[in-house]
Amino acid sequence: SGETEDDFRTTGGELCAIDEEGMSARATQAQEELTYAGYYSTSMFPPVELLYVTGTENDALASALQSMWSTTLGVNVMLRGVTQSEYNARMEAGNYELALQKVTALYDDAMGFLDRWCSEDEQNLISYENGTYDVLMGVARASEDPVARTAFLHDAETMLLGETALSPVYFDGTAHMLRDTLRGVYTDGFGNSYFAGVRANTD
């Protein structure tokens, strides 16, 4: 973000569980919330449909989620793989229960990921509407103070995830190896690595 040593994700904390302990805690929380909602037995919970665009990566992800939800929570998830056009039509009509959606940004900034969930944004396929969220995003957009801007964006992100409008499942990433005798690899916010500045580590 430029205003501190840490970037937006570091200052905001992890979006989802990234280790075994965290995943176990989230699973326990999910079970408790099902009980709190009145589903004392998993047999009481109705089957749910997971909508996604058919493709090797999505097919594998959908199957993995189906298995995890069944094993951990006892929830029966029916998979519905469709074409991109059918997916778009169903999303726009609100004709879905759960849906996989890959989210990318055109530029390396948190605004690129959060702006699309404003009520009137054409990319808002989930039709999320929250006036307070819109205000937070508007203030962040207009702010000339980078620290305040980041704070407003974090508040908006917390609200979006807290209302379970969406939930991160995984993040794309890349990996590279660099000898200890070299330095200078630059990695941008999209995970792309650049090696033009690699040089000998003379320190």
Could you describe each region identified by the protein language model?
Residues 1-10, 56-67, 88-203:
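Detector for C-terminal structural segments
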Residues 27, 84-85, 154:
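Structural motif corresponding to alpha-helix initiation and N-cap regions
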